[in-house]
Amino acid sequence: MDTLTSSPLVSDLPGIAADILARVRGKSPRVHCLTNAVAQNFTANVLLAAGAVPSMTVAPDEIAQFVARADALLINLGTLDRERRQAATTAVEAATTKQRPWVLDPVFVDRSRQRAEFARRMMSMTPQVLRLNGVEFAAIAQAEPAQDALDRYARDQCCVVALTGATDAVTDGGRKLKIENGAALMGQVTAMGCAGTALVTACLAVEKDSWLAASAALLAFAVAGECAAARARGPGSMAVEILDALAGLDREILLTRARVR
């Protein structure tokens, strides 16, 4: 695993994102995804389009073995049944033992007290990146998703917070940036956010600077979404077009289209 630069400027991000994406394609990192049943197929296809190698088992009795052979781990709480609860804890313990980075996506954490409590237990195991939306942040952090709250939570939890929405925000409590790329049509495709988190995980597998990895992945995914939306006729074709856009994403496209501040 490499680090591109210790003190990048926000303006450097498009080029850095291109370099990290090239490393994903060159190294084909294995990403184990404990994700929700709705998201599995699309998530796997997004990872393949980016150049990573996905695995998806949720079986508690074998997930530790899969994680041990992976380069990074994604924990997505979308379908939080009993088997996935057990598997999530086992998977994170295995990742910690093997010093593999992992990402938490606390989907629908705002919908039930039990889910919020489980997500907070997962946070106590210190993911490298927490990727979520504003409503989910308010539920898990018990604070509104203003920049100062994001920064404070990132510092307190010793992780990167990657907040996605109309504008994405990424902070490690010190460094911060906002990404203004993306397309409304992305929100009309099931599992789009979940798949974006998987791309964060793939980038984290090849880049040990968690803030850079998360920032690069969200920028790449948002730009790919814009390119896909320009060609799509609706949600159905959007789901296909973003795979092609991600597979064809290059440095020139990122440098030309990125809107980062």
Per-segment meaning from a language model:
Residues 1-53:
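Glycine-rich phosphate/adenosyl-contacting loop at the front of the ribokinase-like
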Residues 12-15, 223-261:
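Charged C-terminal helix
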Residues 46-98:
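Active-site cofactor/substrate anionic-group-binding motifs, chiefly glycine-
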Residues 54, 99-103, 161:
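Hydrophobic beta-strand scaffold residues
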Residues 76, 83-132:
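Glycine/small-residue-rich loop that forms an oxyanion/phosphate-binding "nest" at active or ligand-binding sites
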Residues 113-185:
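Conserved phosphate/ATP/ADP-binding segment of small-molecule kinases
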Residues 139, 188-219:
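Short, small-residue alpha-helix embedded
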Residues 149-154, 210-225, 242-243:
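Short, well-structured alpha-helical segments that form the helix of a local strand-helix-strand
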